[in-house]
Structures are given as C-alpha cells and as structure tokens.
Amino acid sequence: MENEAGQLVDLYVPRKCSATNRIIQAKDHASVQINVCAVDAEGRQIPGEKTTYAISGFVRSKGESDDCINRLTTQDGLLEGVWSYQR
C-alpha cells in the first residue's frame, strides 16, 4: 500500500522464492535473501549491478539451495562452467 506521496507504507511485503516461485510466508525464519553482484574482468564489483535471490526455508530444508543458486545464476549469465548432476 502507498500513501499520497507514493511511499511504500506496508509493514510486510511478501516475497516469492526464486527457485520454486512460492510465496515466502512471514513466519518462515529459515528463508534467506542473497544478493549476487556482477564483477568486471579484474574481479571487482560493478557498482549498482546486483541480482537478488530469495530462497525459501522449504528449499533449504531439502538441501537444494546450493543447486538452485547455481541454476539461477547460470540462467542469468552470472556464473559459467559449474558442474551439475543434471547434465
């Protein structure tokens, strides 16, 4: 919800899991939000270029968060050449 000035005034903004596209509940204290930055050829961070991933507690409890982060970053072009069991 926004006020007259256009500022966000909600107490809770729901997030979606990047891996499963499920809504992360407010009481899911096992969920994490990870920012992955883009780097240049020298390995330095490019200012302002980051991608945010939200991983739910359900995915983390199954032990699939590492594979999900690898899959998502590879799809977005941030990661190359990672071995995956699925190949």
From Swiss-Prot:
GO terms for biological process: cytoplasmic translational elongation; endonucleolytic cleavage in ITS1 to separate SSU-rRNA from 5.8S rRNA and LSU-rRNA from tricistronic rRNA transcript (SSU-rRNA, 5.8S rRNA, LSU-rRNA); endonucleolytic cleavage to generate mature 3'-end of SSU-rRNA from (SSU-rRNA, 5.8S rRNA, LSU-rRNA); ribosomal small subunit biogenesis. It is found in: Cytoplasm; Nucleus. Belongs to the eukaryotic ribosomal protein eS21 family. The lineage of its organism: Eukaryota, Fungi, Dikarya, Ascomycota, Taphrinomycotina. Disruption phenotype: Deficiency of 40S ribosomal subunit formation, this is likely to be caused by insufficient 18S rRNA stability. GO terms for molecular function: structural constituent of ribosome. InterPro entries: Ribosomal_eS21, Ribosomal_eS21_CS, Ribosomal_eS21_sf. It comes from Schizosaccharomyces pombe (strain 972 / ATCC 24843) (Fission yeast). The modification N-acetylmethionine is found at residue 1. The keyword Cell membrane does not apply. Its main location: cytoplasm. Component of the small ribosomal subunit (SSU). Mature yeast ribosomes consist of a small (40S) and a large (60S) subunit. The 40S small subunit contains 1 molecule of ribosomal RNA (18S rRNA) and at least 33 different proteins. The large 60S subunit contains 3 rRNA molecules (25S, 5.8S and 5S rRNA) and at least 46 different proteins. Interacts with uS2A and uS2B, strongest interaction is with uS2B. This is Small ribosomal subunit protein eS21. Component of the ribosome, a large ribonucleoprotein complex responsible for the synthesis of proteins in the cell. The small ribosomal subunit (SSU) binds messenger RNAs (mRNAs) and translates the encoded message by selecting cognate aminoacyl-transfer RNA (tRNA) molecules. The large subunit (LSU) contains the ribosomal catalytic site termed the peptidyl transferase center (PTC), which catalyzes the formation of peptide bonds, thereby polymerizing the amino acids delivered by tRNAs into a polypeptide chain. Keywords: Acetylation, Cytoplasm, Nucleus, Ribonucleoprotein, Ribosomal protein, rRNA processing.
